[in-house]
Amino acid sequence: LENVALGAHLRSDVGVWAGALHTDRAREAQLLHEAAEQIKRVGLGEYLYEQAGNLALGQQRILEIARALASDPVLLLLDEPAAGLRYKEKQDLARVLEQLRAEGMSILLVEHDMDFVMRLTNHLVVMDFGTKLAEGVPAEVQQNPAVLEAYLGGIDDDLPEADHAKPVSAGGVQ
């Protein structure tokens, strides 16, 4: 709870140090309430009083999102949130991000897991070593020859032409 309350302190006029010193009990209670609401919002309500370090890695990532949400952002910036997560943890994270999008939250996602990205985005930019390769909707981008070359090693010229148009599933791009 206190972990997420740090995010709420960032948007308050009290500040982190005043909050840490407990100088304003009413304000502290309000910030803790906001932190609890954000924890419940991301589906971790049953772990409200659990220490963050005791949570599984996927739950810790979701808790980090709750902390960011406590600062009431207009845009949520996420840098590789699915890195190192197991399949189920990625699915749980994806559900949280889908929920936030449904609520109208704008999300900028930097991620290398293409299955994860394709499931969540309605518009994406693909880069390779700092160079933009493609931009558009997932269905178009995943058929882009430059994207296929960079992330899948190119199109196999031994395949019949009809097979080139079929979605490819390797490294997460379908």
Task: List each model region and its residues.
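Glycine-rich phosphate-binding loops of nucleotide-dependent enzymes
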Residues: 1-174
